Amino acid sequence: MAGAKEIKTKIASVQNTQKITSAMEMVAASKMRKAQDRMAASRPYAENMRKVIGHVAQGSLEYKHPYLEVREAKRVGYIVVSTDRGLCGGLNVNLFKKVVADVKKQREAGAEVEFCPIGARSVQFFNSFGGKVSAHASGLGDAPKLADLIGTVRVMLKAYNEGTLDRLYVVFNKFVNTMSQTPVIEQLLPLPKSEEDEISHHWDYLYEPDPKELLETLLVRYVESQVYQGVVENIASEQAARMVAMKAATDNAGELIDDLQLVYNKARQAAITQELSEIVSGAAAV
């Protein structure tokens, strides 16, 4: 059995770690609330933009934008949004597992894949995973702006415009609630048709002055908005996962301290018993 002094040192070490994890839990909770506010503010815009674009994809247009044309998926691109930091449970691992499974299906179907990782963990993973990394971004912080993503996203849009990509997906952790974050893969291009069950007719639009000019701007803005929404959803998911992970670490540290305290008490009791025995033996010898 370890000595009482050694156990006391271990207890102090675990207590210091517990203070750190407890502080990180509180910081994550504060950041999560702010991230949720940003996510809630941008989600209606992204969802309504998706609905409008879905109607456009179903409409009858004289001008067919390349983003509306369905091509054979020979080359597939993934914009993968991860965290910059760790200590957030299995958030990134689950996301990467989902991407890898989907990539496997695409490769089995004969498609080539390339990646655009956003977030330091994603950049690190795909640099070692194998496959072409066309662009990347990291260090966006807890309050990213759309302008921080435009350059990276447009690299993938350029590849799609030039025909070097036939499909484009965005992958991120969707925030469900504090205890649940779900990795999702959403198709960006070609534009998916609206999935609303209540649609009973097709929408026709009048474009002024020119549908080509309007759609060029609108469709690019749509893709950028969906990627941005994925980033803010992922940040909210990250902070929620980190808060839960740090709470679990704090609770585990408390249990470990209790166990070590019990061992310490036993060691101290054994030391006292031994000292008493030595005193009694010494007195008997005299």
Swiss-Prot record:
Q: What does this protein do?
A: Produces ATP from ADP in the presence of a proton gradient across the membrane. The gamma chain is believed to be important in regulating ATPase activity and the flow of protons through the CF(0) complex.
Keyword Cytoplasm appears in the UniProt entry: no
A Pfam family cross-referenced in the UniProt record is ATP-synt
What gene makes this protein? atpG
What's the name of the protein? ATP synthase gamma chain
Q: Keywords, A to Z? A: ATP synthesis, Cell inner membrane, Cell membrane, CF(1), Hydrogen ion transport, Ion transport, Membrane, Transport
Q: Name one GO molecular function term.
A: ATP binding
Subunit field text: F-type ATPases have 2 components, CF(1) - the catalytic core - and CF(0) - the membrane proton channel. CF(1) has five subunits: alpha(3), beta(3), gamma(1), delta(1), epsilon(1). CF(0) has three main subunits: a, b and c.
List the GO biological process terms: proton motive force-driven plasma membrane ATP synthesis
Concerning PROSITE patterns, the annotation shows: ATPASE_GAMMA
GO CC, sorted alphabetically, is: plasma membrane; proton-transporting ATP synthase complex
> What membrane topology is annotated for this entry?
Peripheral membrane protein
Q: Does the keyword Ion transport apply?
A: yes
> Which SUPFAM superfamilies does UniProt cross-reference here?
ATP synthase (F1-ATPase), gamma subunit (SSF52943)
